[in-house]
């Protein structure tokens, strides 16, 4: 029995069938599974501009495999384009909108399964949230990574352009060089090319078995990506027949596998937020502390941007995520019995993958010679982050810094100060009221961090925030500070010049002010008026949970 029988079977459903006949159904089609094709195609961003080709290939393949595909659209927000603007407040919000849209279309039409096609950062977790909520057979198709831009023999990504802004203000480059970077950073379709958020989340989804092997590192414009989309549709039809559902795959062990792979590839801090949200939706007991536990045992073995040398297409050519998983599996760092949407275990899928990466590449290192001996996403706690915070410490030359607080109430104020060269070596920059509630929307701080790096202060300044960081960020940065300032977190009590310690070795984020003084400040603090009271941002601020629990909107703290 199919779920779609509710709209296709029986005399009472004659009007329903009449509507379906108008969109291409014939007599023989009413017993076939109805499959949603959630198409994130958009000309807003290079991340999504190629998705229509993939969605149409999947649609065709689903029909040939015996399904009845029904295409519908989902939205996207371009993080790269909205970065540093008020529009960035809508980025994390779009994750919830995408999840709500897919859930609404699929459940509203009694669909039997869904294939979601996404590209930009929030497309992946948005689709996964919907899949976990609905628990109908599901497959995710990633739009693919952009190929690197080229300039002077060097690979460029969009982060190169952000860093160039800092370089021009510090006199390291001129406007002509800035324009050259701008014109060459993004050469075509695909998501941002380093191990930034989109590629991190696609790798996590592949690891958890809801997308096909090798698909998360394919280039958007290559033929194999379109072929993989078609194969994904065939797998979805089989999954409907076999009744393979997302919650069969999204187990505690699957999330641990995803975290292990994210550590191994040097992935984005945003993965912490998104995996916590997906796990909470799936009913899996995952906490922020699990990331620290796994970090302690899994090294970083991939030399990938933003802190490394290579981009995601290089990882693909070196063996992709299956090669990384094979190394972890052989070392006992992966649960090989986890199942995938193809009906096979990871042990089975990885059986023919070599136990060693190719000798003619430098992207994937053996575990005996890692980039870093432990994972790069550290969970820091202390009186500034009682619930926790997330620090990305790969490539950090100064993992411990105690310095004076430079306090800013918004990203814009901070960026202006950086570009005016008012931030000095040894400072601890604090950007607050940028959390899920306070922003609202938890903006990414790529513009300030890139400007700091561009001015040569990346190893000399710490930056902490209750907002987020782009997957392209590196340096001594600590985000997701919880509780956030807007709900009374200690970060809201910091004053200009206070001493703050950021210690990645001791996992400490501490405001060096005695408790008596903090109690006085807390008594004097009052909750600020919300920046938005209506529209989607006002609604989001009223509903959203703390970042330490994934910043979801459908489950109160």
Curated annotation (Swiss-Prot):
EC class of the enzyme, as a word: lyase
Residues noted as binding [2Fe-2S] cluster in the record, renumbered to the chain: 47, 120, 192
Positions that bind Mg(2+): 79, 121-122, 444
N6-carboxylysine modifications at: 122
Family membership: Belongs to the IlvD/Edd family.
Protein function: Functions in the biosynthesis of branched-chain amino acids. Catalyzes the dehydration of (2R,3R)-2,3-dihydroxy-3-methylpentanoate (2,3-dihydroxy-3-methylvalerate) into 2-oxo-3-methylpentanoate (2-oxo-3-methylvalerate) and of (2R)-2,3-dihydroxy-3-methylbutanoate (2,3-dihydroxyisovalerate) into 2-oxo-3-methylbutanoate (2-oxoisovalerate), the penultimate precursor to L-isoleucine and L-valine, respectively.
Name the record gives this protein: Dihydroxy-acid dehydratase
Organism: Synechococcus sp. (strain CC9902)
């Amino acid at each position: 029995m199919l779920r779609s029988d509710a709209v296709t079977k029986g005399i009472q459903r004659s009007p329903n069938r009449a509507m379906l006949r108008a969109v291409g159904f014939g007599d023989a089609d009413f017993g076939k599974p109805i499959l949603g094709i959630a198409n994130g195609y958009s000309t807003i961003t290079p991340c999504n501009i190629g998705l229509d080709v993939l969605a149409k290939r999947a649609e065709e393949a689903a029909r040939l495999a015996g399904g009845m595909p029904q295409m519908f659209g989902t939205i996207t927000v371009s993080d790269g384009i909205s970065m540093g603007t008020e529009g960035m407040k809508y980025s994390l919000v779009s994750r919830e909108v995408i999840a709500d849209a897919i859930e609404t279309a699929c459940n509203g039409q009694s669909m039997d399964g869904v294939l979601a096609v996404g590209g930009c950062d929030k497309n992946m977790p948005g689709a996964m949230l919907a899949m976990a909520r609905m628990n109908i057979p599901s497959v995710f198709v990633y739009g693919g990574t952009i190929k690197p831009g080229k300039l002077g023999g060097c690979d460029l990504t969009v982060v190169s352009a952000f860093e160039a802004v800092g370089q021009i203000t510090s006199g390291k480059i001129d406007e002509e060089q800035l324009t050259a970077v701008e014109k060459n950073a993004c050469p075509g379709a695909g998501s941002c090319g380093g191990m930034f958020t989109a590629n991190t989340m696609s790798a996590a989804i592949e690891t958890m078995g809801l997308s096909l092997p090798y698909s998360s590192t394919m280039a958007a414009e290559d033929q194999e990506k379109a072929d993989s989309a078609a194969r994904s549709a065939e797998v979805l039809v089989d999954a409907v027949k076999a009744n393979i559902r997302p919650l069969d795959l999204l187990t505690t062990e699957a999330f641990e596998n995803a975290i292990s792979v994210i550590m191994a590839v040097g992935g984005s801090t945003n993965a912490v937020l998104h995996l916590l949200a997906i796990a909470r939706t799936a009913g899996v007991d995952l906490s922020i502390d699990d990331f620290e536990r796994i970090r302690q045992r899994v090294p970083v073995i991939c030399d990938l941007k933003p802190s490394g040398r290579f981009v995601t297409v290089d990882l693909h050519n070196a063996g992709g995520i299956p090669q990384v998983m094979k190394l972890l599996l052989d070392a006992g760092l992966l649960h090989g019995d986890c199942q995938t949407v193809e009906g096979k275990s990871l042990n089975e899928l990885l059986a023919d993958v070599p136990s060693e990466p190719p000798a003619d590449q430098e992207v994937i290192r053996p575990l005996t010679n890692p980039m870093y001996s432990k994972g790069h996403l550290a969970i820091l706690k202390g009186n500034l982050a009682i619930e926790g915070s997330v620090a990305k410490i790969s490539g950090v030359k100064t993992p411990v810094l105690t310095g004076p607080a430079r306090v800013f109430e918004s990203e814009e104020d901070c960026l202006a100060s950086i570009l005016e060269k008012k931030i000095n070596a040894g400072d601890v920059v604090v950007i607050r009221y940028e959390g899920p509630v306070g922003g609202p929307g938890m903006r990414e701080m790529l513009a300030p961090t890139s400007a700091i790096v561009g001015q040569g202060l990346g190893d000399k300044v710490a930056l902490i925030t209750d907002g987020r960081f782009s997957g392209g960020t590196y340096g001594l940065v600590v985000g997701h500070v919880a509780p956030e300032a807007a709900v009374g977190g200690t970060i809201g009590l910091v004053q200009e010049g206070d001493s703050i310690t950021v210690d990645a070795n001791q996992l400490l984020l501490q405001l060096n002010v005695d408790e008596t003084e903090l109690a006085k400040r807390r008594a004097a603090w009052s909750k600020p008026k919300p920046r938005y009271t209506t529209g989607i941002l006002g609604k989001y601020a009223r509903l959203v949970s703390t970042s330490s629990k994934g910043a979801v909107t459908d489950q109160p703290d």
